[in-house]
């Protein structure tokens, strides 16, 4: 064990025992880890003596690095231990195993970049040496004998084009994909790319019609010169030659490599892209004017839909810029539109997306609701004050001095004698009879009797009094009393109807 533990000594051993096994952990490296690493190296048939130097640790890491992805946890632990030991040998200050691995990866990346730069320099030198004999204008290249030859489009490129059509159909991103895959292609290569499209034959027929129209325009603008063709010169291409239907591959190569060149491949490619634009427009029937942000749609998703539809629009770049500046703000939802208008017309797309981030979320809804409730409360209070329905706080009034702002028990004025309501002495205000009458003109509550809004007595049904024709009759005292009662209560008796009651006599 002593021989195995003698890998480090002195200051290196102190530095080794200060390194933690894990970031933020309590355990640190000890001599037992070196002993374990030596035994593992012997088990894997590696020389444990390599641990004594930094170069030896580097060799061990190169051997173990290829097995890290498929190796066991013991191999990974051994690699981490050797990497940490390498940092100790190289005097690289690290605090834990993860930091040591990061340092090792950084060193390896720098070494790899230097190797790549050296290889690139060698390739550039070789290309410069052979540039006089070989042309790299793919797919038309010049061989060592100085002849211009054609290299067909690779099956991988054709397969990528077919997958794009199958997955994307004719969405706007198909056009830049076609442009990238057909870079430098001849008309024959372009026709091959169009012929391998199995489905979407209606779209292919539309594309053929567009190509025929453009070929006819080319023939109209570039008429054939009269007379024979001078010897050594090639004939001028017609529209059908550019489309690759009446020209051979050698003629196409000759036009593209002549001096001055006639880029029949680029011209044909431009016609195809024009037809693809029409097809994309047909497969994307949604107009840019119909792209509107939903009430709960995030602004980022709305911008994605907007620009995806904008790519399918057949318009110049100036018109598309105007659509972006105008319609993007105009078709946003009310919340985002308020924010975008506050930014001003010169705001960039990044500023717009940053300002509208989070619009429609819970926090934004809560803030908008709070503002709306605050505005509603303020407007209601203003309306009540305008109508005169708003009553301020009722101020208290002192019954002693008659002033407002304090109660009678807190009044500093001399104590008023008697009732505080009528000013008379002998009773208090609670017993004062001079109170405000109710709507019937009665003082309520009364001490006796029924309430003022009830009848105080029930009248009995009566008849009119009988007429008296007693000439010179003597009136008895009882008759006088009855006559007096009749005068006071004319309806309180029925004697006028039934005469003298026998029971009452």
UniProtKB/Swiss-Prot annotation:
One Pfam family matching this protein: Gag_p24_C
PTM description: Gag-Pol polyprotein: Specific enzymatic cleavages by the viral protease yield mature proteins.
Region PPIA/CYPA-binding loop, residue ranges: 223-231
InterPro entries to which the protein is assigned, alphabetical: Gag_p24_C, Gag_p6, Lentvrl_matrix_N, Matrix_HIV/RSV_N, Primate_lentivir_Gag_pol-like, Retrov_capsid_C, Retrov_capsid_N, Retrovr_matrix
UniProt xrefs under SMART domains: ZnF_C2HC
Keywords from the named record: AIDS, Capsid protein, Host cell membrane, Host cytoplasm, Host endosome, Host membrane, Host nucleus, Host-virus interaction, Lipoprotein, Membrane, Metal-binding, Methylation, Myristate, Phosphoprotein, Repeat, RNA-binding, Viral budding, Viral budding via the host ESCRT complexes, Viral nucleoprotein, Viral release from host cell, Virion, Zinc, Zinc-finger
Modified residues (Asymmetric dimethylarginine): 415
UniProt superkingdom: Viruses
KW Transport (keyword) present: no
Region (Disordered): 448-486
GO BP of this protein: viral budding via host ESCRT complex; viral translational frameshifting
Note: HIV-1 lineages are divided in three main groups, M (for Major), O (for Outlier), and N (for New, or Non-M, Non-O). The vast majority of strains found worldwide belong to the group M. Group O seems to be endemic to and largely confined to Cameroon and neighboring countries in West Central Africa, where these viruses represent a small minority of HIV-1 strains. The group N is represented by a limited number of isolates from Cameroonian persons. The group M is further subdivided in 9 clades or subtypes (A to D, F to H, J and K).
Family assignment from sequence similarity: Belongs to the primate lentivirus group gag polyprotein family.
Protein name: Gag polyprotein
The organism of origin for this protein: Human immunodeficiency virus type 1 group M subtype A (isolate MAL) (HIV-1)
Taxonomic path: Viruses, Riboviria, Pararnavirae, Artverviricota, Revtraviricetes
Gene name of the encoded protein: gag
